[in-house]
From Swiss-Prot:
This is Chorismate synthase. Its cofactor is FMNH2. GO terms for molecular function: chorismate synthase activity; FMN binding; identical protein binding. NCBIfam families: aroC, PRK05382.1. Reduced FMN (FMNH(2)). It can also use FAD, however FMN is the preferred cofactor. Its EC number is 4.2.3.5. FMN binds at residues 125-127, 238-239, 278, 293-297, 319. GO terms for biological process: amino acid biosynthetic process; aromatic amino acid family biosynthetic process; chorismate biosynthetic process. It comes from Escherichia coli (strain K12). InterPro entries: Chorismate_synth, Chorismate_synth_AroC_sf, Chorismate_synthase_CS. GO terms for cellular component: cytosol.
Length: 361
């Protein structure tokens, strides 16, 4: 199975399945001498961790990360960093009834078509459980970017179902179980989630992630454009069906005179481009959005087939998130951090001596 690695100079390779013994990853390219402890990684893992509120899956995994290699006496050595998280709360018996049944909307059918077999326990490798390791690796990148370059990466929920959420107050994001920046909408989200739980259904969501302090010049035209790599990274997250950079699909309705980000001696006058022009960072905030589908793991009966081609009715058992977009916030932050760190290292490797007299803001 290929496709388990992302990045060139900062490389992250993950392994493990939802109901396997453990999840793990190898992180290559971390410069030596960076202070790093397991506590540095645990904060973001706790934000993603299941079972932390009544609005997410009640699978209770502590997600305690272990650093196996690449760190000595509290600092990185420059060698590969090995990370491990043990699975402790598997209930594989919940999935015995779907051993021969393809859950509609899941990867069951496509995995078996590709590999001729599948791990039916919680989706195996296709499960979002895998993203725990991305968050751990991303925490390394976030720490490096923040401490060495002052780059801050933040994410939040900006829509759930038909409820739009304005970014009114970033300080509120960590104060509620929805990662919601709009405190006036908390009650509406709570009401929606209660209704979904009662109905046994699920809902989609939109997540926004923002990087501030990113220097101009990151990105490698033409096939490794910064926005292309960000889109690639975010699209690789489970349930993501669309990614926008800046104004995204809204630019369809704009005219060139409206969409262009005009420049004065005081800097850019707008940021429709989301901080990326020609595939290269402009020095403005990088803004990306991703749309997540409603999970198909619901108790509403649906039609499907089994591996023998027979039509059957399907009701998903097990413990699942009614809105996967909630816990996707720290995952999106991690993936953006991984991409930015990779491109920052690539920029330093090729263009460390480049100096210009062009203004920067």
């Amino acid at each position: 199975m290929a496709g388990n690695t992302i990045g060139q100079l900062f490389r992250v390779t993950t392994f493990g399945e939802s109901h396997g013994l453990a999840l793990g990853c190898i992180v290559d390219g971390v410069p030596p001498g960076i202070p790093l402890t397991e506590a540095d990684l645990q904060h973001d893992l706790d934000r993603r961790r299941p079972g932390t509120s009544r609005y997410t899956t009640q699978r209770r995994e502590p997600d305690q990360v272990k650093i196996l290699s690449g760190v000595f006496e509290g600092v990185t050595t420059g060698t590969s960093i090995g990370l491990l998280i043990e699975n402790t709360d598997q209930r594989s018996q919940d999935y015995s009834a779907i051993k021969d049944v393809f859950r509609p909307g899941h990867a069951d059918y496509t995995y078996e078509q590709k590999y001729g077999l599948r791990d039916y326990r919680g989706g195996g490798r296709s499960s979002a459980r895998e993203t725990a390791m991305r968050v751990a690796a991303g925490a390394i990148a976030k720490k490096y970017l923040a401490e060495k370059f002052g780059i801050e990466i933040r994410g939040c929920l900006t829509q759930m179902g038909d409820i739009p959420l304005d970014i009114k107050d970033w300080s509120q994001v960590e104060q509620n179980p929805f990662f919601c920046p709009d405190p006036d909408k908390i009650d509406a989200l709570d009401e929606l989630m209660r209704a979904l739980k009662k109905e046994g259904d699920s809902i989609g969501a939109k997540v926004t992630v923002v990087a501030s302090g990113v220097p101009a010049g990151l990105g490698e035209p033409v096939f490794d454009r910064l926005d292309a790599d960000i889109a690639h990274a975010l699209m690789s997250i489970n349930a993501v069906k669309g990614v926008e950079i800046g104004d995204g699909f809204d630019v369809v309705a704009l005219r060139g005179s409206q969409n262009r980000d005009e420049i004065t001696k005081d800097g850019f006058q707008s940021n429709h481009a989301g901080g990326i022009l020609g595939g290269i960072s402009s020095g403005q905030q990088i803004i990306a959005h991703m749309a997540l589908k409603p999970t198909s793991s619901i108790t509403v009966p649906g039609r499907t087939i089994n591996r023998f081609g027979e039509e059957v009715e399907m009701i998903t058992k097990g413990r699942h998130d009614p809105c996967v977009g909630i816990r996707a916030v720290p995952i999106a932050e991690a993936m953006l951090a991984i991409v930015l760190m990779d491109h920052l290292l690539r920029q330093r490797a090729q263009n460390a001596d480049v100096k210009t007299d062009i203004p920067r803001w």
